[in-house]
């Protein structure tokens, strides 16, 4: 089961080495620290960090943040231990370290081209890592919310981000499962696959949710949030008529405390709702 979910943006601004004295930055960092600390306090047996990357892969658990891409001198200021990680995973690993977490962790990057079905299957696999799994999702919204945004100003961005925020605030992540991948690409939503991994990991409704930060500095929508536990599957109204007999479902046996990385084959997901791109 999922004990809790922390959502933080994979923003370079979180790295102290890359920022100046902008007053927005400390507020964002504090919000991410609070969310990560709440995740650690949920007593997970393992924490999975998920974020966008150039390829879909599991990275070494001892990997650390590396800032060499931002300048040769910054590379020498990166974390001294472990293999270099993609920026989103490196920032997530640092958040866990600074929150005092020393338990098992899994670092999973997701390629931007992964289809929704594969992302949700990946999320479903993550929830089976252990009896108590924490999830740190490094993701963000559109990058088209102002004239100085990376994607300039797009009038569709505000509505897109409102759907993201509404799903998280309400604790029902169903809208994330049918996210319009094409629209997300046009709005430069780098975290689209990570959102859909989250949707696969949390098929039920969150027990409690709290938004710690919501803003769009520099034209990019950042959301920092905490989702606690699960109430169970969202119930759908049954169709009238006689109930058909169904075969019993088999479950894999697993020893308590096992932490494994299961295979992640793609599965078909019914798309009964769509985000509008126009």
Which ranges hold each PLM region?
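Actinobacteria-biased recognition of intrinsically disordered, low-complexity terminal regions
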Residues: 1-2, 228-278
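A short aromatic-anchored loop/beta-hairpin motif
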Residues: 1-87
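Cap/lid and interdomain-hinge subdomains that line or gate substrate/regulatory clefts
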Residues: 77-124
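Active-site beta-strand/loop microenvironment that shapes enzyme catalytic pockets
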Residues: 115-162
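Metal-dependent phosphoesterases centered on the DNase I-like endonuclease/exonuclease/phosphatase
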Residues: 151-179
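Polyanion-binding loop/helix "lid" in catalytic or ligand-binding cores
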Residues: 168-214
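Long, Lys/Arg- and hydrophobic-enriched amphipathic alpha-helices
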Residues: 200-241
